[in-house]
């Protein structure tokens, strides 16, 4: 059974509001180079390079090679990285608003995720501005499911199954 938990607006580009007009920026991302998020970030960096006629070059550091996933937000806030990509739901312990898109079954399609992102954007922008950050864009995460080595047809089939989750909201399931 592949139960769709919800669509997660996950990848965020952040930049420090106080970033200076540098010509070279480092952009850590926790995802491997072949992940679609990193491929999008790599395209973003190429688009910035083209739009600025090479005056701003963003070096993408994939796979947590510059900062681990849980260190990226603080690195941008502290100016160690000029821009970074994070999984917003991973910061729901700081503020519940960060976990809105992690609420299971709240948005179960890309269309619903887009509506949710638009609805929460003003509040997120305000919260992030207070932290010295600005969300540049968000990317929907594909619908989530339960992956198991054996078929899951009833609740009893889950007995003894080990789980991994990426946020407090999904851990509750």
Regions found by a protein language model. Name each.
Residues 19-29, 49-57, 129, 151-162:
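Immediate post-signal peptide segment of exported/extracytoplasmic ligand-binding proteins
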Residues 53-57, 72-86, 161-164:
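Alpha-to-beta junction loops
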Residues 61-74, 166-169:
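Short helix-initiation/N-cap motifs at beta->coil->alpha
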């Amino acid at each position: 059974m592949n139960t769709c938990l919800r669509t997660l607006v996950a990848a965020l580009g952040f930049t420090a509001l106080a970033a200076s007009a540098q010509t070279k920026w480092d952009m850590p991302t926790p995802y491997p180079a072949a992940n679609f998020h990193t491929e999008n970030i790599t395209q973003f960096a190429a688009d910035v390079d083209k739009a600025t006629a090479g005056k701003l070059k963003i070096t993408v550091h994939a796979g947590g090679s510059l900062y681990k996933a849980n260190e990226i937000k603080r690195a941008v806030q502290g100016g160690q990285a000029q821009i970074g990509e994070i999984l917003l739901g991973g910061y729901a312990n700081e503020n519940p608003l960060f976990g809105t898109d992690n609420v299971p079954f709240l948005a179960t399609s890309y269309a619903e995720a887009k509506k949710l992102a638009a609805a929460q954007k003003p509040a997120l922008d305000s919260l992030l501005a207070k932290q010295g950050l600005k969300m540049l864009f968000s990317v929907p995460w594909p619908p989530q499911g339960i992956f198991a080595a054996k078929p899951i047809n009833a609740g009893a089939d889950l007995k003894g199954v080990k789980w991994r989750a990426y946020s407090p909201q999904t851990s509750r399931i």
